[in-house]
Curated annotation (Swiss-Prot):
Annotated Gene Ontology cellular component terms: cytosolic large ribosomal subunit
Database matches in Gene3D superfamilies: Ribosomal protein L22/L17
A GO MF label: structural constituent of ribosome
Presence of keyword rRNA-binding: yes
Function according to Swiss-Prot or TrEMBL: This protein binds specifically to 23S rRNA; its binding is stimulated by other ribosomal proteins, e.g. L4, L17, and L20. It is important during the early stages of 50S assembly. It makes multiple contacts with different domains of the 23S rRNA in the assembled 50S subunit and ribosome.
Name of this protein: Large ribosomal subunit protein uL22
Keyword tRNA-binding: no
Keywords recorded for this protein, A-Z: Ribonucleoprotein, Ribosomal protein, RNA-binding, rRNA-binding
Lineage, opening ranks: Bacteria, Bacillati, Actinomycetota, Actinomycetes, Frankiales
Any one Pfam family match given in the protein's UniProt record, by short name: Ribosomal_L22
Gene Ontology terms describing biological process: translation
SUPFAM superfamilies per record: Ribosomal protein L22
C-alpha cells in the first residue's frame, strides 16, 4: 500500500497528508465495510457519512479521517474545502487470543482481532455543479 508521503505529495502526485490509527480493537472486515463508504469522497461528505453510519467502526474511521484533514491543514497549509479521501485502507493487526471456559473442562479460543486504519487525503480542485452534470450534444451528420 502507500508508504510515507514524499514531500507532502501523494502517490498520484497531488498534495496531501496521511493519518493512521494502529492496534484499533475492531475486526478488519468490519472496518473495511465502513472504509468502503468514504473512499473517493470529499472530506466533508465523508465525515457526514461516518457521523451517521450505524457501524461501531465508523467512530474510529471518523477520527482518522478528521486527523488526516487536520494534518493537511496544519502541516501543509492545504485548504480543507479541497480535500478528498484519496487512499484509505485497513490492515490486519495482531490478534489477541483469549480462552472461554466451556462445559466438561473444555475451552474455546476467542480471537480478538485488531486493525491498522490508514487514510491519505489529497487536495484536488472542487468539481463545479455545472461541470458535473453537463452533457455534450452530438452534431447531426
Amino acid at each position: 500500500m502507500a508508504d510515507d508521503l514524499v514531500d507532502g505529495l501523494t502517490r498520484a502526485g497531488l498534495p496531501g497528508a496521511k493519518a493512521s490509527a494502529r492496534y484499533v480493537r475492531v475486526s478488519p472486515t468490519k472496518a473495511r465495510r465502513v472504509v468502503d463508504l468514504v473512499r473517493g469522497r470529499s472530506v466533508g461528505e465523508a465525515l457526514d457519512i461516518l457521523r451517521f453510519a450505524p457501524q461501531a467502526a465508523s467512530e474510529d474511521v471518523y477520527k482518522v479521517v478528521a486527523s488526516a484533514a487536520a494534518n493537511a491543514e496544519n502541516n501543509h497549509s492545504l485548504d480543507p474545502a479541497t480535500l478528498w479521501v484519496g487512499e484509505v485502507y485497513v490492515d490486519e493487526g495482531p490478534t489477541l487470543k483469549r480462552i472461554r471456559p466451556r462445559a466438561q473442562g473444555r475451552a474455546y479460543r476467542i480471537r480478538k482481532r485488531t486493525s491498522h486504519i490508514t487514510v491519505v487525503v489529497e487536495s484536488r480542485e472542487p468539481v463545479s455543479a455545472a461541470g458535473r452534470g453537463a452533457k455534450t450534444t452530438r452534431r447531426a451528420r
